[in-house]
Amino acid sequence: NKGLNTRLRLESVHNAMEQSKTVANTIMGNKEPYDQVPWFWSDQYDHKLQLVGISGDHDEVVMRGLESEQKFLLFYLKNSELIAVNAINSSKEFLICRKLVANKVKISSDVIKDQSVNLNDLLL
């Protein structure tokens, strides 16, 4: 994955569909590399888990929301750049987080923790 700067095997419905489109385009002569930010979701009983990005190379993890309410997000940062987000029962915020990770937004932990900050405003 060019965007992640590594080779990576991912198994998800979305990834399989998008990579098959890339292969078909390559066969047709359009050699655009596959460089989408990976994302996944899973429903586990009454919890919706959603993940975007690859968090393995982070140097900071910041929680937004309350774990006790079982609705929160974990933001994974590397040198203040947002590289991944794990969302628990936070589907609306997750849609914004997908864009934030794709745009490689630089963000401070204080801003992430501040519930008065609208995540949409960080896309500007």
Task: Report each predicted region and the residues it spans.
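Mid-to-C-terminal Rossmann-like scaffold of FAD/NAD(P)H-dependent oxidoreductases
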Residues: 1-91
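C-terminal auxiliary extensions adjacent to catalytic cores
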Residues: 68-124
